[in-house]
Regions:
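Short, flexible loop/turn segments with low-complexity composition
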Residues: 207-209
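Nucleotide and nucleotide-moiety/phosphate-recognizing core
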Residues: 3-160, 168-184, 191-192, 198-205
Length: 209
């Protein structure tokens, strides 16, 4: 476990899968659901994991995982982050940071968690996102809970919806990750994406993931 247990892991699993036509979390890639791929990567690296979802989530019961509803269904990922922060406060948790992971991106490398730990020690920003191949990955980030009030205000009163717009307003810093032969941040939105992911699983991982 992390020696400095001040980060809560949050899996944002709330997005309605309009393009997929079914609940993406339960789609199988190899012998695991997309959500299980993500959970198996992070479960041993965090003391506690929160899943934010606007529909029921079917996972094997694990003692360090809590599932909560998205308190603003359909307002996008910012609302999921806010739901997590509010839960954290209401339950008097001591975590100072929230690390977010999307539930539809099974190939990310767990080394990013070490990067988060390094960055939050610097304390030169309240928000960091991963950047790879010149692309910012707005759902792979670590957020200070000091942002709660402002996030709530901007979401409810100022109609912020896009993660990027809000992050730019806050002054996000990026964590640059070396590019790989394939994109570890490839996310699955469509049935075509799922076929691509199956290829990646075979070619890069020999189905071992």
């Amino acid at each position: 476990f992390m020696e400095d247990n001040n980060i809560l892991a949050v899996v944002l699993a709330g997005g309605k899968s309009k393009r997929f036509g079914q609940d993406k979390n339960q789609i199988k890639l190899g012998d695991k659901t997309l959500l299980d791929h993500v959970l198996s990567k992070i479960s041993s690296r965090f003391e506690e994991i929160l899943i934010v979802s606007s529909h029921s989530v079917d996972i094997k019961k694990m003692k360090n995982i809590t599932i909560i509803p998205d308190c603003f269904d359909d307002l996008g990922p910012l609302a999921g982050v806010l739901s997590a922060m509010k839960w954290l406060k209401e339950n008097h948790k001591r975590y100072q940071w929230v690390a977010t992971f999307p539930s539809d991106t099974p190939f990310f490398e767990t080394s990013i968690i070490e990067e988060y730990k390094k960055k939050i020690k610097l304390k030169d920003s309240l928000l960091y996102f991963i950047k790879s191949n010149n692309k910012k990955h707005n759902i792979f980030g670590v957020w200070s809970i000091e942002l709660l009030k402002q996030l709530e205000d901007d979401l409810i009163n100022n109609n912020f919806r896009k993660v990027e717009d809000w992050a730019n307003k806050i002054g996000v810093k990026t964590i640059d990750i070396e590019p790989k032969k394939f994109d570890p941040f490839f996310n699955i939105n469509t049935k075509e994406d799922l076929e691509k992911a199956k290829k990646i699983l075979k070619e890069k991982y020999n189905d071992q993931i």
